[in-house]
Amino acid sequence: MAKGKFERTKPHVNVGTIGHVDHGKTTLTAAIATVLSKKFGGEAKGYDQIDNAPEEKARGITINTSHVEYETTTRHYAHVDCPGHADYVKNMITGAAQMDGAILVCSAADGPMPQTREHILLARQVGVPYIIVFLNKCDMVDDAELLELVEMEVRELLSKYEFPGDDLPIIKGSAKLALEGDQGPLGEAAILALADALDSYIPTPERAVDGAFLLPVEDVFSISGRGTVVTGRIERGIVKVGESLEIVGIRDTQVTTCTGVEMFRKLLDQGQAGDNVGVLLRGTKREDVERGQVLAKPGSIKPHKHFTGEIYVLSKDEGGRHTPFFNNYRPQFYFRTTDVTGSIELPKDKEMVMPGDNVSITVMLINPIAMEEGLRFAIREGGRTVGAGVVAKIIE
């Protein structure tokens, strides 16, 4: 069957299912795709199609992820589901599947379990902004008080990790019943209620072009008679000729002016998110700019070198280290386009980190990098990737 043309008529939102193993994440994913395709059109996907997730590589790390698409009246959703816990950890830390919001699936029969907690913590660390809860398997719980208790537990757990536990939507249902076409309140109706919650509770994400201009510097040239040209792909925002910009990271922040934007050897009056461009800078010398810095809208981003992060350490099979590392380990941190050496401080209760682990760390870089919470990085040793991480909180 030919792939249908991607119609950009509705705003696009990225979501995913998270939660403990066997609480019904994949069944729910299949149920949403099936129920919504009946109502709004689109393609239904069966449980088996979603469960055997294809392997993908993100930053050299193999991750199994299933992608499902569905529509509501107002939006188009891309939904990710992972078969195993390790896949979730890798996915969320590498940002391979950015989520504008997550659906936390929790079995009403079991209540919150260790991975429920771990996924909520990960969501907090990697900056998933919104969580909606689907209390699954409600058909297996006859006692209304027990349901209330589980709901309370889930809300408390979310509040503990700084999500608005008391206010976020919790939908009660049964993904299995919905998948079977059940017309009761726990079946298809619960899935439609979940779709409404997605539409109303998760705000439409800001498009990359609406953000504050940022371009990671890949290369720098000097063109005689014209000045210095910086090349790279615009990460977000728009740059117009005549605007003043800041060069941020590695050394002291400098102010410069954009006097030209080039793409495919053509002169433009502006460049926008996604464009590979050359930006001509006035009054900036070739040696004042280097790969690893960023060009940015003045005041929009600051250089930092001390932060906490959440990292996943590649296993030996993934080409990672064969041995653990300890406190004060000093690898390179690859941010955007360059490596910066830094030292790792482990949590007090952690003596060492084994390949295949994920852990919260504190990092001190030797040079500052233009940084924001949510920025992804790779950890490398001599050019070889040994881990992936995300900035959780900036210390200074």
Curated annotation (Swiss-Prot):
Residues 81-84 are annotated as: G3. It is found in: Cytoplasm. Residues 136-139 are annotated as: G4. It holds the Pfam family GTP_EFTU_D3. Keywords: Cytoplasm, Elongation factor, GTP-binding, Hydrolase, Magnesium, Metal-binding, Nucleotide-binding, Protein biosynthesis. Residues 60-64 are annotated as: G2. It comes from the Bacteria. Residues 174-176 are annotated as: G5. Its EC number is 3.6.5.3. Mg(2+) binds at T26. It catalyses: GTP + H2O = GDP + phosphate + H(+). Residues 19-26 are annotated as: G1. Residues 10-206 form the tr-type G domain. GTP binds at residues 19-26, 81-85, 136-139. Monomer. Belongs to the TRAFAC class translation factor GTPase superfamily. Classic translation factor GTPase family. EF-Tu/EF-1A subfamily. GTP hydrolase that promotes the GTP-dependent binding of aminoacyl-tRNA to the A-site of ribosomes during protein biosynthesis. This is Elongation factor Tu. It comes from Herminiimonas arsenicoxydans.
